[in-house]
Amino acid sequence: MPPHLYLSMHWTGRLTAEEQQNILDWIADERAKSSLSSDAIKSLKGEPIQPLPLKVALDERKVALGHKLFFEKLLSGDETMSCASCHDLTKGGTDQAKVATGIRGQQGPINSPSVYNASYNLAQFWDGRAKDLQEQAAGPVANPGEMGEEWDNVVKKLSQVNEYKNSFDALYAGKGLTKTTVTDAIAYFEKSLVTGNSRFDQYLRGNNETLTTNEKAGYELFKLNCASCHFGPTLGGGSYEKMGEKHNYFNLRGGELTEADNGRFNVTKDEKDRHFFKVPSLRNVELTFPYFHDGSTANLADAIKMMAKVQRNKDLTKDEITQIEDFLKSLTGEYKGKLVTKLNDKDVQ
């Protein structure tokens, strides 16, 4: 029986072990019906994580245009920065810095999230203020602390480049080069940034030998402690959750609270959303350090320890942390047929 129906009829009752298992079985059955699980082997279709696709069907001409724009410094006010400055594809789609640095060395208020697999997110930015990739692409360009340029100037500069003008005339017939078509092209390229074929994806598709015993043990621990928030093909991006569900994260972190610490509240102004953030993807997580919205945690083991404490009230052993860390490293995927950990500038530009 679906959990919401059971609880509506037995809202004061306690679930027996058998009833709990029945609900878990129902959840697994529902997951198995998802199209995202279509290429997982039958016995693993009900897992909380689904494999990423090996290929995404896209118009390669628009991908190429968006790719060029992603690395285009004309988008910034002083022409020193591009999207790739904060979302380096050789660094897990981040800048591996505590907070982003904008034009003229300005320090931003928040950690740069990964651009890889971002098309799977329910919204963009840590606070979800952009509904999709196109809306997100428009923001940093006009932000004075990031790329610091006006969109009218961006369009004017790009229009003076014949290659851009001709490409937009061809691919956006009747529209040409505008803010809307530029952000659409960038977003379209970002849809191609899917890092499939990780060792864990291979495991879900039936290669039982691709994971070590330690990694499998880590996955079992992960399912018990982490998968209620980090689920789906990207292990995140599907919900907003409170930072510090069981313990006050900000007290443990120390330091003054910042506006960025408000999280989703900054968008909705609803007190219930204070300190809620979009759950980050854990794909390629070994590369996306430092961790959390504030970039406060330098290494993955400490991030696991902190999350277990503040979200689950668990004090994991050193061995348990190592096992979960080993599992998370099995989530590192490929871009253009090469492991993300091995990409260099030539591979991505």
Specify the residue positions occupied by each region the protein language model found.
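Terminal end segments
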Residues: E320-T322
